[in-house]
Curated annotation (Swiss-Prot):
<dbReference type="InterPro" id="IPR001789">
    <property type="entry name" value="Sig_transdc_resp-reg_receiver"/>
</dbReference>
<dbReference type="InterPro" id="IPR011006">
    <property type="entry name" value="CheY-like_superfamily"/>
</dbReference>
<dbReference type="Pfam" id="PF00486">
    <property type="entry name" value="Trans_reg_C"/>
</dbReference>
<keyword id="KW-0902">Two-component regulatory system</keyword>
<dbReference type="Pfam" id="PF00072">
    <property type="entry name" value="Response_reg"/>
</dbReference>
<dbReference type="GO" id="GO:0005829">
    <property type="term" value="C:cytosol"/>
</dbReference>
<keyword id="KW-0597">Phosphoprotein</keyword>
<dbReference type="InterPro" id="IPR036388">
    <property type="entry name" value="WH-like_DNA-bd_sf"/>
</dbReference>
<keyword id="KW-0805">Transcription regulation</keyword>
<dbReference type="GO" id="GO:0032993">
    <property type="term" value="C:protein-DNA complex"/>
</dbReference>
<protein>
    <recommendedName>
        <fullName>DNA-binding response regulator MtrA</fullName>
    </recommendedName>
</protein>
<comment type="function">
    <text>Member of the two-component regulatory system MtrA/MtrB.</text>
</comment>
<dbReference type="GO" id="GO:0045893">
    <property type="term" value="P:positive regulation of DNA-templated transcription"/>
</dbReference>
<dbReference type="InterPro" id="IPR047671">
    <property type="entry name" value="MtrAB_MtrA"/>
</dbReference>
<keyword id="KW-0804">Transcription</keyword>
<feature type="modified residue" description="4-aspartylphosphate">
    <location>
        <position position="53"/>
    </location>
</feature>
<feature type="domain" description="Response regulatory">
    <location>
        <begin position="4"/>
        <end position="117"/>
    </location>
</feature>
Amino acid sequence: MRQRILVVDDDASLAEMLTIVLRGEGFDTAVIGDGTQALTAVRELRPDLVLLDLMLPGMNGIDVCRVLRADSGVPIVMLTAKTDTVDVVLGLESGADDYIMKPFKPKELVARVRARLRRNDDEPAEMLSIADVDIDVPAHKVTRNGEHISLTPLEFDLLVALARKPRQVFTRDVLLEQVWGYRHPADTRLVNVHVQRLRAKVEKDPENPTVVLTVRGVGYKAGPP
């Protein structure tokens, strides 16, 4: 079954280029040029991933992202101009999984999309734990004392990466490669913002974390079991 990408961008020429590239890679695509309409499109089309421009008529991309993330774990990749560095952080804090700067190479875009869609439906049984948090890997389920903790797919992948190697301290660059699929140096703000988002969900007290620990000057590691 072909995976569906929803392109949300009011630049008609860019949206057409994205459609051509993505369809050439085997994806189905739909295009929306308005932020408010994008919310309806996500509910009706149930896309596997959303490519979301920051600057949109109707509702800007940051607000769209925030509303989507309130009730959906659909992967969101922001499209942004190089001058929008402040908005990039706001977008990540609002729930975006990744971002790509315009102008970009089609191969780079496709690689980012595939990285976010990469799932393994045949994962062997694997149960992990960090502190008092339990992780059922093949079921993509996280619980504390039997109560479900809702995570986005990327937040789940980040937690699993840490849990699988509890003695390892992960640099941000290593996490960018293992979780986001980057093969070159990239913006480590991606990691910092997602760790904050993950802590807000899995920690009893995010200001005093026991699940995802910071190793000052190095990176992050899993808390003790």
